[in-house]
Regions:
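Small/polar glycine-rich anion-binding or flexible loop at a beta-alpha turn
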Residues: 221-232, 268-273
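A short interface-forming secondary-structure element
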Residues: 228-245
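Beta-strand/loop nucleic-acid-binding surfaces
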Residues: 62, 244-247
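ATP-dependent adenylation/nucleotidyltransferase module used to activate substrates
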Residues: 2-171, 233, 251-262, 266, ...
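Short glycine/threonine-rich loop-to-helix capping motif typified by GTGT followed
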Residues: 193-200, 243, 275-278
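Charged helix-capping and loop-helix junction motifs
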Residues: 201, 248-249
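Short secondary-structure capping/turn micro-motifs that flank functional sites
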Residues: 66, 94-96, 184-186, 226-227, ...
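Mid-to-C-terminal catalytic subdomains of enzymes
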Residues: 156-160, 166-221, 228-229
């Protein structure tokens, strides 16, 4: 009997390819532009399609406390390999790009990006492409109002969801530049009004350490315990790494307690919908 291979996502893939072709053609009309390039999977996928369309792209990376070192390294590797001009602007101000998770008084993230671009005299007149999903654009509109006129949102305007970005990222094998690190680091905190720079750094370093131990998809959540009880690191592992994590829990505990965490717990349960999303 002949073996039959059933392609489960054939219809989705065909629709996706047609939309992807439109997304390649749309930015091409601008000739050259600046892309907000954080190294997140959305920005890597957007950069890939702009390059495919022959657009001359410049990468603007705002190196702020909420950008993980792994994503920054991925952005550098990508630009270096493809010979792209990248300017990394260092700032101690936190760039909260997720409009669904903003602390009171948080600045408009596009304002920070625009200020950084404005300091680059030869880039100031170029349009700024925002590699955001439809969900992110809707959240931005709800929080900050109309989109700035000098920005381009082709992916959101084509209805690209976060799921679509992830599909395109893996379809084009962009994880060869480094595994995704679970999105914005501010998602590792429950109370954003109390978030501090050194706490974000602790989380980022802990996730890097776990990646070096073989847990490259681990997420570390920060929980202040109050008083003299210090801070708790809650480690969440994907299903396929939980058994290995259980076997090495003592190594994990020792490693993270050496990073100023007072308590460490390994979360082996499947996250519920109301928990923090990574």
């Amino acid at each position: 009997m002949d073996t039959k291979i059933v392609v489960l996502n054939q219809g989705y893939d065909q629709t996706f390819q047609a939309r992807e072709q439109r997304l390649i053609e749309t930015p091409a009309g601008h000739g050259e532009l600046v892309i907000s390039f954080s190294g997140r999977l959305e920005s890597c996928y957007a950069m890939e399609l702009c390059r495919a369309g022959g657009v001359r792209v410049r990468a603007l990376t705002l190196d702020n406390p909420l950008l993980s070192r792994r994503e920054l390294a991925r952005a550098r590797r990508y630009c270096l390999h493809h010979g792209l001009e990248q300017r990394v602007i260092k700032t101690e101000e936190m760039l909260f790009c997720d409009a669904n998770q903003l602390p009171p008084g948080a600045r408009d993230p596009l304002q920070l990006l625009d200020e950084a671009r404005g300091r680059q005299a030869d880039w100031a007149a170029l349009p700024l492409l925002i590699p955001a999903s439809l969900e992110e654009m809707q959240a931005y509109l709800g929080r900050f109002g109309p989109l700035p006129g000098h920005t381009l949102w082709p992916f959101a305007e084509q209805g690209m969801s976060h799921r679509d970005f992830r599909y395109g990222f893996h379809r084009r094998e962009l994880d060869r530049w480094g595994k995704t690190s679970g999105g914005y680091l501010n998602r590792r905190f429950q109370d954003l009004s109390q978030i501090q720079g050194h706490q974000v750094q602790m989380i980022d370093m802990a996730e890097q350490l776990l990646a070096d131990m073989g847990f490259d998809e681990a997420q570390v959540f920060f929980h202040p315990l109050g008083g003299e009880h210090g801070a708790l690191a809650r480690i969440r592992l994907p299903a396929h790494q939980r058994a290995h994590g259980f076997d090495r829990q003592q190594d994990i505990y020792r490693a993270l307690k050496g990073m100023a965490f007072d308590h460490v717990t390994l979360d082996l349960a499947q996250p519920r919908r109301h928990e923090i999303k990574g």
